[in-house]
Swiss-Prot record:
Oligomer and partners: Homodimer.
Organism (species): Bordetella pertussis (strain Tohama I / ATCC BAA-589 / NCTC 13251)
Domain of life assignment: Bacteria
Residue segments, region Important for dimerization: 244-279
GO molecular-function terms, A-Z: coproporphyrinogen oxidase activity; metal ion binding; protein homodimerization activity
InterPro entries found in the cross-reference section: Coprogen_oxidase_aer, Coprogen_oxidase_aer_sf, Coprogen_oxidase_CS
Keyword match Cytoplasm: yes
GO biological process: protoporphyrinogen IX biosynthetic process
Protein known as: Oxygen-dependent coproporphyrinogen-III oxidase
One GO CC term, this protein: cytoplasm
Length: 303
C-alpha cells in the first residue's frame, strides 16, 4: 500500500509547494529563491525562501522527502514498538514572517511518515499523517481570527463534523508555552498520528488542510498589509517574536525531529524570525494595543 501511496503523496506535496510560492510571489511582487539539497543518509528536498522582502521579511516554504534506517527518539517516543525500524518522512512546512507588524505570522505543515516493516518480522509498514495551520498575530483583530478559523473548519467539515473541534483543541494545547502560560497565537488546527480512517481518507483530509492555507491567510494579508506602523510597533513585534523562538527551540516536535535525525540545519531553522528580542520582566501598559494581545493568547471559540 505505502509503496504505491508514496509517489502520490510526494506529487501532491510538490504541487502544493509550487502553488503556495506562486501565490506569495504574486502577493509580494518578489521572487523566492530555490535551494535544492540532498541528504547523505537518504532523500533530500527543495527549499523556497525569501529574505528581506517588503511584504515578507522572511519566508520559507519547504518540501522534504527524507529516509533513514532507524527511527529517531522524537518519532518513536509515542510508539515504542516502532523503535529500530527504517523510515521515510515527507512534507511541506512553511513559516511566513511579514514585515508589517499588523500582518500576523503564520505556519502551515502537512506531512506523512512511514515506518517500514523489518525483514523477517511478522509486521507491516505503518503510516501516519499529520499537519495543521496556525496564526500568530502581534496586533490581533477579531475579524481575522474568525476568518482564519472558519477556513480551518470549512476544510475539515467535509471529512466529519467532529474533526474541527478536536483539531482546534489539539492546536490550542500543542502551541502552548508552558513557561509563559500563554498560547503562541490564536491557534488554528493541528493533528498527528492520523491513520485510523485508512490511507485514502487520511490522505484526503491532509490535502484539504494543505489546500486551505491560501484562502485562510491571504485575505488577512491583503486587509492589513498597508496599515501604517512605526518604531513602536516594530519593537513590539520583535519582542513577541521572541516567544516564537522559544516555542520552536523548546517544544516543537518538528524542530526536534529534524535535529535528532541529522536534518538540514539551514532548513530546520528557516522558521526562525529574522529579528527578535527579549526584555526582563516587561509588561505592556494597560489599555494599549499591545496589552490587548493578552486577551487573544488563551483558547477561545472563534466560530
Amino acid at each position: 500500500m505505502t509503496a504505491v501511496a508514496i509517489p502520490a503523496v510526494r506529487d501532491y506535496l510538490t504541487d502544493l509547494q509550487g502553488r503556495i510560492v506562486a501565490a506569495l510571489e504574486q502577493a509580494g511582487g518578489e521572487a523566492f529563491r530555490t535551494d535544492a539539497w540532498q541528504r547523505a543518509e537518504g532523500g533530500g528536498g527543495v527549499s523556497r525562501l525569501l529574505e528581506g522582502g517588503q511584504l515578507f521579511e522572511r519566508a520559507g516554504v519547504l518540501f522534504s522527502h527524507v529516509k533513514g534506517t532507524r527511527l529517531p527518539p522524537s518519532a518513536s517516543a509515542h510508539r515504542p514498538e516502532l523503535a529500530g525500524r527504517g523510515w521515510e518522512a515527507m512534507g511541506v512546512s512553511m513559516v511566513l514572517h511579514p514585515r508589517n507588524p499588523y500582518v500576523p505570522t503564520t505556519h502551515m505543515n502537512v506531512r506523512m511518515f512511514v515506518a517500514a516493516a523489518r525483514p523477517g518480522h511478522a509486521e507491516s509498514d505503518v503510516f501516519w499523517f499529520g499537519g495543521g495551520l496556525d496564526l500568530t498575530p502581534y496586533y490581533p483583530f477579531e475579524d481575522d481570527a474568525r476568518h482564519f478559523h472558519r477556513a480551518c473548519r470549512d476544510a475539515l467539515d467535509p471529512h466529519g463534523a467532529d474533526y474541527y473541534p478536536r483539531y482546534k483543541q489539539w492546536c490550542d494545547e500543542y502551541f502552548f508555552l508552558k513557561h509563559r502560560n500563554e498560547t503562541r497565537g490564536i491557534g488554528g488546527i493541528f493533528f498527528d498520528d492520523l491513520n485510523e480512517p485508512g490511507f485514502d481518507a487520511s490522505f484526503a483530509l491532509t490535502c484539504s488542510v494543505g489546500d486551505s492555507f491560501l484562502p485562510a491567510y491571504l485575505p488577512i494579508v491583503q486587509a492589513r498589509r498597508d496599515m501604517p506602523y512605526g518604531e513602536r510597533e516594530r519593537d513590539f513585534q520583535a519582542y513577541r517574536r521572541g516567544r516564537y523562538v522559544e516555542f520552536n527551540l523548546v517544544f516543537d516536535r518538528g524542530t526536534l525531529f529534524g535535529l535528532q535525525s541529522g536534518g538540514r540545519t539551514e532548513s530546520i531553522l528557516l522558521s526562525m524570525p529574522p529579528l527578535a528580542q527579549w526584555r526582563y520582566d516587561w509588561q505592556p501598559q494597560a489599555g494599549t494595543p499591545e496589552a490587548a494581545l493578552a486577551e487573544f493568547l488563551r483558547p477561545r471559540e472563534w466560530v
